[in-house]
Amino acid sequence: AAIFLKAAELVAGPYRDKINAATMLAQSKTIFQAEIDAACELVDFLKFNVHSMQHIYSQQPKSEDGVWNRLGYRPLEGFVYAVTPFNFTAISGNLPGSAAMMGNTVVWKPSDHQIFSAKIVIDVFKEAGLPDGVINAVYGDPEMITNTVLDSKHFAGIHFTGSTSVFKGLWKKIGTNIENYNSYPRIVGETGGKDFIVAHNSADTDELSTAVIRGAFEFQGQKCSAASRVYIPKSISKDFFEKLKSEVKKIKMGSPEDFKNFMTAVIHENSFDKLVNAIEKAK
């Protein structure tokens, strides 16, 4: 626990500017989005995980007079495979870190588009005192790495954040290989969402338009929590859409190095092409 509390101190202090800058430059987040993710949320994850671990260990069976009952926890019998996405630097510290905190050896595959800040996360853990070989970052072809990992008899668990389709494929392959493993792997995953906003007819349309714009377009909508649907009562729809269109026209877009920009670039060319196709279909 002390190692990860120290890591939280390092992220909040001497590494704060570096991890924010890496998230801005390599993942194209604005300064605000980088700060609430790479610094604030990562610190929260690290501290909350320590709190949760202490809570788990505190849940002990009763000990009567002359008897001391003690419940201990062992790591999994093998290694944990952590797979993290590009869109949250905090998740890249949380998924491998929480598994390591409970005594597991971790093979960690960061997103190809998040390698810069992932390297800084590793540097933080190392400076905090994490021994070499506990969290092992592996870069390269995702399919090759995953197939190698899931074919190992020592694979004992997966900690995943990413798309629903990829997670289903991983689950299916693990099931196919179940006879080859030394134990039953733990499968933990967080996947995509289709979040929505529901407005009441008493809603303030100024506040509502702001909420929709921020929910849909912050970090270019590249979050599972991004607002993808909005349900508006007919009684306020005209006023709302007029204000929404007016505010959307004011959005500034450009480099994250300009702190006045609200939006920046999407993560890669394929993402851009997908959005262009969706817009063309909508027309």
List where the protein language model places each region.
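Long amphipathic alpha-helix in the N-terminal Rossmann-like dinucleotide-binding domain
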Residues: A1-D17, M24-Y57, V67-L71
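Proline-centered turn/helix-capping motifs that create local helix->coil transitions or kinks
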Residues: A12-R16, V50-P61, E179, K250-M253, ...
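Conserved residues at the C-terminal ends of beta-strands
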Residues: S52, V83, D141, T161
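Conserved small-residue-rich beta-alpha loop and adjacent elements
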Residues: S58-D132, D206
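A structured beta-alpha segment of the ubiquitous adenosine-cofactor-binding alpha/beta core
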Residues: N69-L71, N136-H159
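Hydrophobic/aromatic ligand-binding patch that stacks against planar heteroaromatic rings
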Residues: S98-A100, V149, E179
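ALDH superfamily catalytic-core signature
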Residues: V124-G129, D151-K153, G157, T164-K283
